[in-house]
Amino acid sequence: MEDKKKRMAIIASKGTLDMAYPPLILASTAAAMDVEVGIFFTLYGVDIVNKKKIRSLKVAPIANPAMPSPIPFPNILGVLPGMTSMATMMMKGMIKKINWPTIPELVDICKEAGVRMIACTPTMEMTGVEKEDLIEGVEVAGAAEFLDFALDANINLFI
């Protein structure tokens, strides 16, 4: 009897720099372990695969109290002008220091590993994103298409 290949389904709903890493790292790692992987990018998660936004994802320090900082500051200071830029710059510095790939590099790694990437049609309609705005290789489909994949998954994650 032939073993069925393991499958992992991920929903990526956040489009910030810090929240783009978990689905892409998990997907690329699972694919390297010979797991069939699909990521459904919905709501702000579509920004991760949007050519116009992929290189400018940001980190919002407000409501992110666990964010490491060389200088501790109260969470309320996150509302001040320039704090998002500062937090983004700090995170990019930490990422570079530990030699992690950038988000565009991770997306390429996922594509090369055969990770199926699906952008949510209703989200695209709601936000005015066109198929041409997406990076090459991203499918466009609704929830039913993703659920068809996810219903047979061994692991389902919502990030």
Protein language model annotation of sequence segments:
Residues A31-A32, K111, A150-L151:
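Anion (oxyanion) recognition and catalysis
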Residues V37-L43, I118-T121:
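Short internal beta-strands
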Residues G45-K58:
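N-terminal beta-loop-helix "entrance" segment that forms/cooperates
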Residues Y21-M33, I39:
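Histidine-anchored nucleotide/phosphate-binding helix
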Residues L57-K92, N99:
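A glycine-rich helix N-cap at a beta->alpha junction
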Residues I10-A20, V49, M94-I98:
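Short, glycine-rich nucleotide/cofactor-binding loops
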Residues M83-M117:
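Alpha-helix-centered segments that form part of catalytic cores
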Residues I95-K96, A119, M124, E132-I159:
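Glycine-rich, aromatic-bearing surface loops/beta-hairpins
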